[in-house]
Curated annotation (Swiss-Prot):
Capsid protein self-assembles to form an icosahedral capsid with a T=3 symmetry, about 26 nm in diameter, and consisting of 89 capsid proteins dimers (178 capsid proteins). Involved in viral genome encapsidation through the interaction between a capsid protein dimer and the multiple packaging signals present in the RNA genome. Binding of the capsid proteins to the viral RNA induces a conformational change required for efficient T=3 shell formation. The capsid also contains 1 copy of the A2 maturation protein. Acts as a translational repressor of viral replicase synthesis late in infection. This latter function is the result of capsid protein interaction with an RNA hairpin which contains the replicase ribosome-binding site. Keywords: Capsid protein, RNA-binding, T=3 icosahedral capsid protein, Translation regulation, Virion. Homodimer. The capsid protein dimer binds to the viral RNA via an operator hairpin, but also many other RNA sequences in the viral genome. The keyword RNA-binding applies. This is Capsid protein. It comes from Enterobacteria phage SP (Bacteriophage SP). Its main location: virion.
Length: 132
């Protein structure tokens, strides 16, 4: 089990020149969802990441790893009060059988990272262009 620690994401953004530091906010004791967010004065404007690992159950035979990202955008014109004008979300769900190996899980993780860096996926996300 990994300890919930501060996470720093570097080389992010369109030009790869941004850094984001996420601070642990705790683990929900009911559902085991770990929460991290950008330290900010207004909670609604914080960038958030949640991570959870669900164990197999009677109805579901696989482990389910869920990662969610939320990036709110704040109003910055005309000295408005802090408010969220829009948000971008990402929701990634990975599913593994209890028999999967750490090698297989690492392969999926690294394939996903490489896929997100591929020009086809970059164009789809950044420019909202569908594949043809």
């Amino acid at each position: 089990m990994a300890k919930l620690n501060q996470v720093t994401l570097s080389k992010i953004g369109k030009n790869g020149d941004q850094t984001l530091t996420l601070t642990p906010r705790g683990v929900n004791p009911t559902n085991g969802v770990a929460s991290l967010s950008e330290a900010g004065a207004v909670p609604a404007l914080e960038k958030r990441v949640t991570v959870s690992v669900a164990q197999p159950s009677r109805n579901r035979k696989n482990f389910k790893v869920q990662i969610k990202l939320q990036n709110p955008t704040a109003c910055t014109r005309d000295a408005c009060d802090p408010s969220v004008t829009r948000s971008a979300f990402a929701d990634v769900t990975l599913s593994f059988t209890s028999y999967s190996t750490d090698e297989e899980r690492a392969l999926i993780r690294t394939e996903l990272a490489a896929l997100l860096a591929d020009p086809l996926i970059v164009d789809a996300i950044d420019n909202l262009n569908p594949a043809y």
